[in-house]
Amino acid sequence: RVWNTNPTHPIAQGIPESFELKEEEMYGEFFDIPKPDDVVFLSWYRGGEVFRSGCTWQRGYGKIFYFQPGHETNPSYHNPYVLKVIENAVRWAAPVMWRENLECPNIVESPESKYLKK
């Protein structure tokens, strides 16, 4: 079961309080990650194991979202709520505006330059 622990977060929009995944690979805490800015989803597994399964961070201009469900051998990507979370996360992480070139001296052409050229 995946619990929506932060229903006001943009990634959680349109996601119910909880939803079931028939099969999913189980992970457990201690999950050695930096302290998240937000925990959007928690997963619960039979036996009582709980896992921070949806976390966000912001680093500089970048936004990062980790989402645990979706092992390639399980049908998680067919779940409409998993697909909605991924869609919401892409929209959340997308830049609101293109930023000025960051002037990295060791990079000949910055990755964002192709979007800034007219």
Question: What spans do the regions from the language model cover?
Answer:
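Extracellular ligand-binding/catalytic regions of CAZymes and related secreted enzymes
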Residues: 48-52, 58-118
